[in-house]
């Protein structure tokens, strides 16, 4: 992911879902234990991000001033796209593919489609 985070991390409750837990797996376990009628603030955003983090390692490209925030949320920080691609290639190998999603809110990604 790439973002300047000019407005910070978004909702405080969203941030706390990750900052107060040891992993994305713990976020998922805690969310799954909440009855549907007792859904908490920003729960759905945390649930979606945790689901993504189960499937993929999230590398977040943003300024150094946001590094601690990103790492507290259990993602890897990178200072630029080149560094993020190097991290991904180290983990997945030189033949790994990259998916570019220009607008995360306006794009639906389906696995196995190009």
Locations of regions flagged by a protein language model:
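C-terminal non-catalytic interaction/assembly regions of soluble proteins
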Residues: 1-114
């Amino acid at each position: 992911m790439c973002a300047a985070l000019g407005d910070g991390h978004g909702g405080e409750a969203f941030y706390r879902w990750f900052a107060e837990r040891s992993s994305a797996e713990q976020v998922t376990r805690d969310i799954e234990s909440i009855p549907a009628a007792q859904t908490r603030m920003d729960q759905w955003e945390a649930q979606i991000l945790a689901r993504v983090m189960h499937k993929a390692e999230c590398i977040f490209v943003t300024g150094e001033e946001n590094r601690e925030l990103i790492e507290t949320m259990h993602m890897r920080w990178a200072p630029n796209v080149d560094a993020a691609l190097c991290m991904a290639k180290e983990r997945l190998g030189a033949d790994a593919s990259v998916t570019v999603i220009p607008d995360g809110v306006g794009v639906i990604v389906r696995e196995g489609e190009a």
